[in-house]
C-alpha cells in the first residue's frame, strides 16, 4: 500500500505526458533526438469558477468536462509537435483550401469529425446492442427479456475491448500506452515517497486504481444496472433514455473511482478489479526516456506545501 495518496493525475499524449496538479498542468514532450521539453497547459475550469460544482455527485460530470477540455488541448499540442517533426509539403489542393478559406476549413473538418465520432459511438454502444437483442428475442421468444440489460452491457464491453485490442496494434497507440505506463509508475513512485528517478520509477506497478481506463470500464458496468430501470425495448427510445442517464452513470462512477484511489480495503479492491484487469490492455511498460518525460512533468506540478496529498 502506498505511503500517501496524491490528487495529481495524468494523461498519455502523442510522444509525451500530461500531469495535472492542484495548481497547474504541465505536459512533457520527447523529440526524436531524445530531448525533453515541458510546457504548461491550461483551460478555464468550471469547478474553479463555481465551487458548488466540487460537491460529491455533482463534481463527476463537470470534472469529466474539464478533463476532456484539458486533454483535447494537450493532445492537439502534442499532435502539432509530432506533426512539426514530420512536416510534409502541402499539396496544391491543400494550399488552395488554405488560401481560399484559411483556418475555417480546418475548424469545419475538426467539427465534422467530432460529430461523426460521437454519432458512431452512440450507434455502436447504445443503438446496436438494443437492435441485436430485439432480433434475438424474435428468434427465442420473450423468455429472455429480463436479460436485456445484461446482454446489451456485455456486448458494449466486448465492443470496447475489441476496439482497444485492434488500435493497440498501431505503433503510435502502442507508444501512447507505454507513456501511460510511465505516468502510472511515476505517480506510484511519488506516492511511495521515493526520489523521482528512472531507477525508482521502473520498479513501480503499472496499474493504478484511479486510471481513466478503469473509469470507462466502471461506467460500462454501471450502465448494466441503469439499463434494468429503462422499460423501453424500442432502440430509439432506449438509446435516448440511456443518453439521458449518462450524467448519473458518470457521477456514480467518479465517486467510486475516488474511493478506490483513496482507500485500500476489500470493497474498494473488488470495485477496482475489473478496471485493473482492463489496464493490461491500455498500460504497457515504458522506456527510460518515457519515464524521464513523466518525471519532468511530475516534478513541475508537485506543490511545495503538499496540498495535493489527500491521505
Model-found features: residue ranges?
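Polar-ligand-bearing catalytic/cofactor-coordination segments
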Residues: 2-13, 17-19, 146-217, 259-263, ...
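Transmembrane alpha-helical segments and their cytosolic interface motifs
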Residues: 105-123, 204-229
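Divalent-cation
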Residues: 1-83, 90
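Juxtamembrane "helix exit" motif at the C-terminal ends of alpha-helical transmembrane segments
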Residues: 77, 117-141, 219-241, 246-250, ...
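Membrane interface segments of multi-pass transport proteins and intramembrane proteases
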Residues: 93-104, 133-151, 230-240, 259-269, ...
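Cytosolic juxtamembrane amphipathic/interface segments immediately preceding
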Residues: 2-3, 7, 12-13, 47-54, ...
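Residue-level signature of transmembrane alpha-helical entry/exit and packing/kink sites
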Residues: 106, 110, 114, 148-156, ...
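Short, charged cytosolic
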Residues: 29, 63, 67-98, 178-196, ...
Amino acid at each position: 500500500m502506498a505511503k500517501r495518496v496524491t490528487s495529481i493525475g495524468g494523461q498519455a499524449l502523442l510522444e509525451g505526458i500530461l500531469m495535472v496538479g492542484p495548481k497547474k498542468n504541465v505536459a512533457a514532450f520527447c523529440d526524436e533526438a531524445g530531448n525533453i521539453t515541458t510546457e504548461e497547459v491550461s483551460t478555464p475550469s468550471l469547478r474553479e469558477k463555481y465551487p458548488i460544482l466540487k460537491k460529491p455527485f455533482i463534481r463527476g460530470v463537470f470534472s469529466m468536462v474539464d478533463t476532456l477540455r484539458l486533454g483535447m488541448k494537450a493532445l492537439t499540442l502534442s499532435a502539432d509537435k509530432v506533426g512539426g517533426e514530420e512536416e510534409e509539403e502541402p499539396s496544391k489542393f491543400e494550399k488552395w483550401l488554405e488560401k481560399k478559406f484559411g483556418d475555417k476549413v480546418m475548424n469545419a473538418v475538426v467539427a465534422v469529425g467530432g460529430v461523426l465520432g460521437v454519432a458512431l459511438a452512440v450507434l455502436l454502444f447504445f443503438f446496436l446492442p438494443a437492435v441485436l437483442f430485439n432480433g434475438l428475442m424474435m428468434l427465442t421468444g420473450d423468455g429472455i427479456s429480463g436479460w436485456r440489460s445484461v446482454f446489451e452491457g456485455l456486448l458494449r464491453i466486448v465492443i470496447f475491448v475489441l476496439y482497444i485490442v485492434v488500435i493497440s496494434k498501431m505503433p503510435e497507440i502502442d507508444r501512447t500506452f507505454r507513456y501511460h505506463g510511465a505516468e502510472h509508475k511515476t505517480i506510484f513512485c511519488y506516492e511511495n515517497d521515493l526520489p523521482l528517478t528512472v531507477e525508482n520509477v521502473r520498479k513501480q506497478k503499472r496499474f493504478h486504481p484511479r486510471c481513466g481506463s478503469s473509469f470507462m470500464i466502471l461506467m460500462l458496468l454501471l450502465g448494466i444496472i441503469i439499463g434494468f430501470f429503462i422499460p423501453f425495448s424500442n432502440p430509439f427510445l432506449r438509446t435516448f433514455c440511456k443518453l439521458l442517464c449518462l450524467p448519473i452513470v458518470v457521477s456514480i462512477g467518479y465517486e467510486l473511482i475516488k474511493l478506490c484511489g483513496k482507500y485500500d480495503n476489500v470493497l474498494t479492491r473488488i470495485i477496482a478489479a475489473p478496471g485493473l484487469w482492463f489496464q493490461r490492455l491500455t498500460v504497457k511498460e515504458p522506456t527510460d526516456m518515457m519515464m524521464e518525460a513523466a518525471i519532468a512533468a511530475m516534478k513541475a506540478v508537485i506543490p511545495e506545501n503538499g496540498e495535493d496529498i489527500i491521505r
